A protein has these predicted regions:
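Nucleotidyltransferase catalytic core that binds NTPs
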Residues: 1-161
Length: 161
């Protein structure tokens, strides 16, 4: 269950298919919690990643496994929001969470490997405006924190704006 009493807190959001959830996801969550003093990290499991052609394993099994590997990480909450928000898009999830946790800061978490296609995401520009900070991690290199202004500059360069 995602905690509803997180007023004036910092909440990280890590979305994906989690097929399967693995130590890298846990590592991203722990590093973001430590670096940003997050109260909670929400793993938002999607039924189907719009950028992946393959059919993922059963949602129930993926969710159960994600919860199992986090049994000792009480700050990580695992949930599929698609039935609630009627969308599998990150922009819609962030809008929902910003409304639900009005007085909290939302921190968007993602692997740096997703940055290359970020400009293809529906509502990517809105996501950059709604989230104060992003946490990007490259799994095989040093962890890096990237503030939103720097990220906007990267996106502008990619799009030649």
């Amino acid at each position: 269950m995602v905690q509803g009493k997180l007023e004036n807190k910092k909440i990280g959001v890590l979305g994906g298919s989690f097929d399967p959830a693995h130590v890298g996801h846990v590592r991203i969550s722990k590093l973001a919690k430590k670096n940003y003093d997050l109260s909670q990290v929400i793993w938002a499991i999607t039924k189907q990643n719009p950028f992946k052609k393959n059919n993922p394993n059963d949602l129930y099994k993926r969710t159960a496994y994600a919860k199992k590997i986090n049994k000792n990480n009480k700050f990580i909450k695992v949930k599929c929001f698609e039935e609630i928000i009627k969308s599998n898009r990150t922009v819609d999830l962030i809008k929902y969470l910003k409304k639900k946790f009005k007085h909290s800061e939302i921190f968007f978490l993602m692997g740096a490997d997703n940055l290359i296609n970020f400009h293809k995401w529906k509502g990517y520009n809105s996501i950059t405006k709604m989230c104060k900070y992003w946490y990007l991690i490259e799994m095989d290199t040093n962890q890096r924190l990237l503030d939103l202004n720097h990220l906007r500059n990267i996106i502008k360069k990619q799009l030649n704006l």
